[in-house]
Amino acid sequence: MSRYQHTKGQIKDNAIEALLHDPLFRQRVEKNKKGKGSYMRKGKHGNRGNWEASGKKVNHFFTTGLLLSGAC
């Protein structure tokens, strides 16, 4: 089991109260997955790009040994 490294420095008096004010136990707002307030500006798969066009670039720079052997 790993130990949590708190950010409160040297705890002197009340360790439980110091941990309650640590960022580990801060309040978090959950984002709705569906319904009101669930719109996400960036899509789920928006950063993948166009995968069909990327494969065409690889074939453009590909050279074979047949071209080199015909020059001799």
Swiss-Prot record:
Active protein is only produced when SsrA(tmRNA)-SmpB-mediated trans translation is limited. ArfA can be synthesized from truncated mRNA, via ribonuclease 3 and the SsrA tagging system. The arfA mRNA is cleaved by ribonuclease 3 within a hairpin structure, probably immediately after the Gly-55 codon, which produces a truncated non-stop transcript and leads to ribosome arrest. In the presence of SsrA, the stalled ribosome is rescued and the incomplete nascent ArfA is tagged for degradation. In the absence of SsrA, truncated ArfA chains are released from the ribosome and are functional. Changing R41C: About 20% ribosome rescue activity, initial rate. Belongs to the alternative ribosome-rescue factor A family. Changing A18T: Loss of ribosome rescue activity. Does not affect binding to the ribosome or to tRNA. Still recruits RF2 to the ribosome. Changing A18C: No change in ribosome rescue activity. This is Alternative ribosome-rescue factor A. Residues 33-47 have a biased composition (Basic residues). Residues 30-53 are annotated as: Disordered. It holds the Pfam family ArfA. Changing Y39C: About 25% ribosome rescue activity, initial rate. Transmembrane segments: none annotated.
